[in-house]
Amino acid sequence: MQTVLIALLRFYKVAVSPMLGNRCRFYPSCSDYAREAIQYHGAARGTYLAARRICRCHPFSAGGIDLVPPPTSEKR
């Protein structure tokens, strides 16, 4: 599942993102953040973190540096 999601993100970055222009208010960009989150946290949690990030990326947001949180070693 991770591989499929990352492939979709790469497709978005190559095919769709250039048409929309650079609009992300954060560093790293939302698509890079999503890729890192999925790689570090897996498909489910990574997608959740990416969705939260995308919801924060809007014209009224200050933006800035927002890195993917490190994985926790605790099992719940």
From Swiss-Prot:
Q: Where in the cell is it found?
A: Cell inner membrane
The source's domain of life comes to Bacteria
Q: What is its main location?
A: membrane
Which keywords label this protein? Cell inner membrane, Cell membrane, Membrane
**Key word Magnesium present:** no
- Topology with respect to the bilayer: Peripheral membrane protein
InterPro entries per record: Membr_insert_effic_factor_YidD (IPR002696)
Tell me where the signal peptide lies. Answer: none
- Gene Ontology cellular component terms for the protein in this record: plasma membrane
Identify the PANTHER family for this entry. MEMBRANE PROTEIN INSERTION EFFICIENCY FACTOR-RELATED
By sequence similarity, the record places it as follows: Belongs to the UPF0161 family.
What role is this protein assigned?
A: Could be involved in insertion of integral membrane proteins into the membrane.
Indicate what this protein is called per its UniProt record.
Putative membrane protein insertion efficiency factor
From which organism does this entry originate? Paraburkholderia xenovorans (strain LB400)
